[in-house]
Amino acid sequence: MTAARNPNAFDSILLVAFGGPPTGAEGYPFVKGIVGDRPAGEARIREVAGHYEHLGGSPFNKLTYEQSIALAHELKTRGITAPIFSGFRHWNPFLREVVAGMAKSGHKKTLGVILAPHQCWVSWDWYKDTVTAANQPLEQPLALTYSDPWWTSAGYIDASADKIKAAFDVLGPKAKDAALIFTAHSIPINMCAQCKSGERKCPYTPQFSESAKAIAAAVGRSEFHLTYQSQASQHGQWTQPDINALIEQQAAKGLKAAVLAPIGFLCDHVEVLYDLDVEARKTCEKLGVQYVRASTVGTHPAFIRLLADKIQERFDGAPRLMGDLVLS
């Protein structure tokens, strides 16, 4: 029998994510909305918009909704039936609209879940700031709390490891000598100075490294590479090495096959489908390296259970209410 959960903990759950345009034609306004009106960025805007056109749009929102549906089913088995809303920073439905709609519908206490495995200003703090900016002006703002991060939690590690093992299986006998290459989104070095997340200054790269080490151990690999991808600009310093540069370096040393594992992403959206499956694949083919890409965690049951665990921790830890009294 499912144990009864604290019904007064939260009346709603908000999944907070990046977002993406569902059609290729919407790629340009989407990218421009991120980069802004800087004239120097126009060429890069058109270049990246072309990736969305090439793929016919981004599946990001659709895949996030699939995660929310799977999460709702898992939570229901635990006695948690609070409705789940999905809001995006860079595309419809925008966080400002979702938060306002939740408040208008009478929701009062919301648990936010940031869909990012590693914390930095752009992947964590910016999301929270966006939600706060949407919430504060409301006549009756939501009382917001966020679930904890989970970069080394078992569900994320196990789900990632399963996806990587499946990718190595594709290689057959070549798997033994294939390289395991982890990727995460490259970020500007100066962005670390803005980071407020975690107990250490900008935990993004240490968390990525810790995730990779744990996942590699679960896969049974003692050797692996850490790389970054999808650098948004040629200006300034960014986290390195770049995925394509590392492939070139390893190919020069005799590498013949590689499994790329985009553990910095939670679903197979454009940064994965284009920057890896098109660009990194092209680099591999040019150098005679067999390319295999592990799927992201998506709706893997272990990952969904992990999200549910983090939500349940908050629900069970919330004070129980009786009238105007808080029962501690």
Language model region names:
Residues T2-S328:
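Active-site-proximal alpha-helix that buttresses catalytic centers in soluble enzyme cores
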